[in-house]
Design a protein with these regions (language model features):
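N-terminal export/targeting and maturation segments
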Residues: 22-72
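Sec-dependent bacterial lipoprotein signal peptides
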Residues: 1-21
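Short, solvent-exposed recognition patches
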Residues: 56-112, 117-120
Length: 120
C-alpha cells in the first residue's frame, strides 16, 4: 500500500473512532435513574416556571451526568448531555409521570420515570 493510502486508511479509522466515541448512551442503572428522578423533582419544586439552571445549582445526581445544559420547563426537566442542531441527546423527567414526551419517536423510557431523547 502506498504511503498516501496508508494515511487515508489511518484517518478513516481515527474519524470512525472519534464519531463513535462522541455518541452518548443513557445509564440503565436503577439507583442512578432514581437519583436523577428525585433531583429533577426537586428542581421542578424550586422552579415552577421555565428556567435554565446554573451549573453551580445542579443537584449532584444530575451533575454526575456532566450535562451541557439543565432546564426546567412546563413539561419537565431536560438534561442535555450533548447538544445538537435539533436538540441533541439527554435525559427528560416529566412533571406528570404518565405524560408521555413528544414526539414519541425521539424518546425512550430508560426507567424510574426517566426518558432518554436523541436526534431524529
Amino acid at each position: 500500500m502506498s504511503p498516501s493510502r496508508n494515511l487515508t486508511a489511518a484517518l478513516a479509522v481515527l474519524t470512525a473512532l472519534a464519531l463513535t466515541s462522541g455518541c452518548t448512551r443513557p445509564t440503565r442503572d436503577p439507583t442512578e435513574l432514581k437519583a436523577i428522578t428525585e433531583a429533577s423533582r426537586l428542581l421542578m419544586k424550586l422552579h415552577p416556571a421555565d428556567a435554565d439552571i446554573p451549573r453551580a445549582r445542579w443537584p449532584r445526581a444530575i451533575a454526575r451526568l456532566e450535562p451541557e445544559l439543565v432546564s426546567v420547563t412546563s413539561s419537565g426537566v431536560h438534561i442535555t448531555t450533548k447538544a445538537y442542531f435539533d436538540g441533541g441527546w439527554g435525559y427528560f423527567v416529566p412533571r406528570r409521570e404518565r405524560a408521555l414526551p413528544e414526539p414519541v419517536d425521539r424518546f425512550e423510557k430508560v426507567g424510574q420515570g426517566v426518558y432518554w431523547w436523541h436526534p431524529y
